[in-house]
């Protein structure tokens, strides 16, 4: 147990700093865990699978007895064990990706716990010496020369084939894509075209090149819209000092309607006929409210606007 306590104490000093527990507190915690049967062997302390049961048991004991000494010590030890394990896994993964060996991901054992600075320097020196001794024979080895062999007979030296220096046959395409190898030959049959000269363009009356897409005739579209669309009519507007005011399109009709409303009221047959004639024209709601302002008085117009809205 002394060796385990020493390793755990060293790890706590490395990762916990000034808050690391003493060896006496660590020993008391380990004895309590063995007494309660949470640790069959001290090596089980390094297994992550036993951390949760230990935490649960110590938490329950602290709640029942009201003593949290072992729980506090276990919290510091657990933090040190997790930090050491993460550092070991990260180091092994880095070695694996860099091709330096390692790459295992497993629960850390006693050898995975952080060692003191002196031991780390000694181990680092031994590893460097071993790596240098392993790489030395490979560096001093003479490089092998690879001889070139004949393409037909396979003889490296003394080939008498007439086609020994002939290049391999050209690559034949699969036929999925068109080849441009014969385009230059077809152009060269009619004469060499100097570099930078403009290629002759196909005339409109000649065949040989597919015509391009037809352009949109916007002028024709505008004429068709102007002939088939609704007529565009602008309402006359008079600009006054207080702002724009509506001008009736039919002054005589508006004047007659105003006179009929003034003489017989809104319910008179003449007024109703005049209103129907006025409403038969394509007027917008804003255009309807303007003649009512002219025909009606201030009070009837206010009542009519409330009913209209």
From Swiss-Prot:
- Which GO BP terms sit in this record? viral budding via host ESCRT complex
| Matching Gene3D superfamilies | Human Immunodeficiency Virus Type 1 Capsid Protein, Immunodeficiency lentiviruses, gag gene matrix protein p17
Record motif PPXY motif, residues: 168-171
Residues of the region (Disordered) are: 127-146, 177-213
Q: Where is this site: Cleavage?
A: 151-152, 162-163, 173-174, 235-236
What is recorded about the protein's domains? Late-budding domains (L domains) are short sequence motifs essential for viral particle budding. They recruit proteins of the host ESCRT machinery (Endosomal Sorting Complex Required for Transport) or ESCRT-associated proteins. Gag-p19 contains one L domain: a PPXY motif which potentially interacts with the WW domain 3 of NEDD4 E3 ubiquitin ligase (Potential).
State the name under which the record lists this protein: Gag polyprotein
- Source species of the chain: Fujinami sarcoma virus (FSV)
